[in-house]
């Protein structure tokens, strides 16, 4: 694995420290418990050594006197620990001090991997951050289980209850043997009849070609998302995506994103007229009925065709698909249906949280970070799949 390109590790931890670890697969939590056990028991043994040295310096002889079992409840589960003791002292006080730090330690162990640190570099990073060593075998075990969690997410069965599907791509920079290169992540977000938004899946590809999109969408279809409940697919355009959607979800009405279309139209308008044109477009996109929107579009053409024929052409060529949201029967708000804003907000979160890391170190680090951010966002919507129930998403 290529070493991570992290500009400032402390800033990186600061950015992602609030991400939850509640959704990690049980095997990953087991590995984290093992690492916690090593860290805490090492600290207790060091504490006993320091105590015995102090006693010798004071002329008060003492010696080790075995250990006893104790439990510590943590975010990743119950730890069974061996508490070392001497004839006059036990390390229980050290354990009590650690009880106040367990949450941050657990997150630190997992976040080292989310940050894209190589297995070789996680141990030294943990030593500098925690002041405690974690064995290479434990580090390797955590990395393996974390990646298994990501793969389980990509392979889980999908239910077919979404009313709206939003699909888009995000471009990120990744290190390769030929230097930093741009890599595209294809992402699908579903919206339930109750308005809950969930990142369904993502896939890393070289670019947004028809073949790449078709493979991604077919994988969703084969896992259960066959589109029987879908009323709308929202996109920002792209010939490859449109061709793939026609093959996989051709029966579902297509909605073009009004935010993207507005920007594209304004590209053909002089700066001094952009506010007026934008207001005219707003009257179309925010019309309450299809008929009202069509009339507003007619007025737009009459008003601006002479001055900005390319702007008018840009609008007219996609107008039917821009107004699809006014023709579907759903309880969802129009603001949810007419743009890809829901998925764009999550893309901004990915960029914000990954900015301190610079360029992603490799494909694995990119997968881990997107998985962590998207699971965090899904949890806020109460749509994250518990990993013990990965056979079917909610």
Question: Language-model features: where?
Answer:
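Acidic/histidine-rich catalytic cores and adjacent linkers
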Residues: 1-4, 12-20, 41, 45-49, ...
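Short, conserved DNA-binding cores of transcription-related domains
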Residues: 1-96
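RNase H-like nuclease fold core
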Residues: 64-65, 78-87, 93-104, 108, ...
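Short alpha-helical segment immediately N-terminal to, or the first helix within
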Residues: 111-115
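DNA-recognition alpha helix
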Residues: 120-131
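A polyampholytic, Gly/Pro-enriched intrinsically disordered region
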Residues: 161, 272-289
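Conserved beta-strand -> loop -> alpha-helix junction used to position metal-binding or nucleic-acid-contacting
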Residues: 232-239, 244-280
């Amino acid at each position: 694995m290529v070493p991570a390109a992290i500009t400032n590790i402390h800033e990186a931890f600061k950015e992602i420290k609030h991400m939850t670890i509640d959704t990690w697969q049980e095997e990953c939590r087991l590995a984290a418990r093992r690492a916690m056990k090593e860290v805490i028991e090492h600290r207790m043994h060091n504490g006993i050594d320091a105590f015995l040295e102090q006693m010798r310096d004071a002329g008060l002889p003492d010696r080790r006197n075995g250990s006893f079992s104790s439990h510590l409840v943590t975010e990743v589960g119950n730890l069974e620990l061996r508490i070392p003791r001497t004839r006059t002292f036990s390390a229980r006080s050290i354990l009590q001090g650690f009880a106040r730090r367990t949450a941050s330690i657990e997150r630190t162990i997992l976040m080292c991997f989310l940050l894209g640190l190589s297995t070789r570099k996680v141990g030294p990073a943990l030593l500098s951050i925690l002041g405690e060593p974690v064995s290479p075998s434990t580090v390797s075990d955590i990395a393996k289980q974390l990646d298994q969690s990501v793969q389980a997410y990509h392979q889980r069965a999908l239910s077919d209850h979404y009313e709206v599907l939003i699909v888009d791509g995000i471009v990120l920079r990744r290190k390769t043997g030929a230097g930093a290169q741009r890599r595209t992540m294809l992402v699908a977000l579903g919206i339930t009849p109750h308005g809950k938004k969930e990142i369904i899946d993502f896939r890393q590809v070289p670019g947004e070609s028809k073949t790449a999109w078709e493979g991604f969408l077919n994988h969703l279809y084969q896992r259960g998302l066959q589109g029987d409940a879908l009323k709308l697919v929202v996109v920002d355009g792209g010939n490859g995506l449109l061709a793939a959607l026609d093959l996989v979800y051709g029966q579902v009405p297509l909605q073009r994103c009004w935010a993207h279309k507005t920007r594209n139209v304004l590209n053909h308008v002089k700066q001094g007229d952009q506010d007026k044109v934008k207001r005219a477009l707003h009257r179309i996109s925010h019309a309450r009925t299809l008929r009202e929107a069509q009339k507003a579009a007619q007025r737009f053409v009459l008003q601006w065709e002479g001055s900005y024929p390319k702007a008018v052409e840009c609008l007219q060529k996609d107008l039917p698909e821009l107004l699809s949201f006014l023709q579907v029967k759903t309880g969802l708000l129009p603001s949810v249906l007419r743009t890809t804003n829901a998925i764009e907000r999550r893309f901004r979160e990915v960029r914000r949280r990954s900015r301190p890391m610079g360029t992603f170190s490799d494909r694995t680090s990119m997968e881990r970070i997107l998985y962590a951010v998207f699971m965090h966002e899904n949890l806020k919507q109460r749509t994250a799949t518990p990993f013990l129930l990965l056979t079917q998403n909610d």
